[in-house]
Amino acid sequence: MEPVPEEARGVGDDEGELDCLTHMIGALLLQKEPENPENGDSKETIWSGELEWEDAQILDQPKTLHTVQCKICSMVKEGQPEINTENWPNKLKTQLIPKKVLGKIGEQFLKDARMVVFRSSQGEVLNLLITAMSSGFAGCIHFPSNPNCNIKALILIYSRDHQALVGFIPNNEDSFSERLQEILQGAKRKPGVKTPKQPQPEEPPPVEEDAIINELLWTGSLNWSTQASLEEPSISHKLECSVYIAIKNGDPGISAEDWPTDMPMVLMPSIYLGQFAGAFIKDSKLIILRSTPGEEHDSLASSMSAGSCGCARFSSEVVCKVIMLLYSSPRNAFLGFIPRDQANFVKRLREVLDEHRQKARNKE
């Protein structure tokens, strides 16, 4: 397989959707796995063989080929696995592509997909792949043409929350494959070092390659508290930071003029967000929060890496009502999304919180 050149590391709406989905894979797709395999649906090994990939390199540098023995597990419903792998090859060749390229395809394909989990006991070799995927890459497995195999492509993403490689097989195979090829061909036309592009008469520049600019939206402090246990006092935190927004065609689509200088935030388990936020992420504005590395930055990053997300709530005088924040390790930055449908998002968030509070009271 030909390597795909890595694009410039800008932050766009599509990539933001993918990063958020990556962070919430466990909540959206893995949370229903029962602790006791004898209860409810279980996972069954449906394929065993070799997973092969090359180092993600730029330009014409030598590449190293890696191979790891692994197995693929799928959910079993009514005694039958969701995926039929009878005609799959014994070796799956994986192409590493930048998440930004994959994000342009559209996260609707990941939502309307079947899921599998890759497992391997060869930790040292597998860590090489995990490291690459934690650095801004995803895997794409192309299946050879076979009339007896109805699978054309599988997308592989690493879920840090559950320390697992999760594969997605889009249900709309034809549309996904066509869109993937369009994006890959567009990426190959973009060199690692950008130079002015001259539109060709027979091939005008694709719409998806419009420039994305990160514009400063707000500067202030983020305030939250943590508590190690109920017996210990809470600790207040304050992080000086700036919020940038990804804009196209010079229009940010949102104003922060009425945002307070001190932004209050509460931490909550990201699984709460994962129960309902997928539908809102697609219709949201993406922001990126940057701060100087330090004790407070590391404290918040540690909390979010351990399974928390941030919810910044504003007063009734502010047009924007809520911002959700997640931590992106590859960028060492906090990504946020502002739902366009603020009222319904806040309503659904309250419902989910009330449900969990009621469950907690019932256990007492």
From Swiss-Prot:
Cited InterPro entries: Med25_PTOV (IPR021394), Med25_PTOV_sf (IPR038196)
GO biological process, one term: positive regulation of transcription by RNA polymerase II
GO CC terms, sorted: mediator complex; transcription regulator complex
Region (Disordered): 187-207
Pfam families: Med25
Similarity-based family: Belongs to the Mediator complex subunit 25 family. PTOV1 subfamily.
PANTHER family (UniProt xref): MEDIATOR OF RNA POLYMERASE II TRANSCRIPTION SUBUNIT 25
Protein name in UniProt: Protein PTOV1 homolog
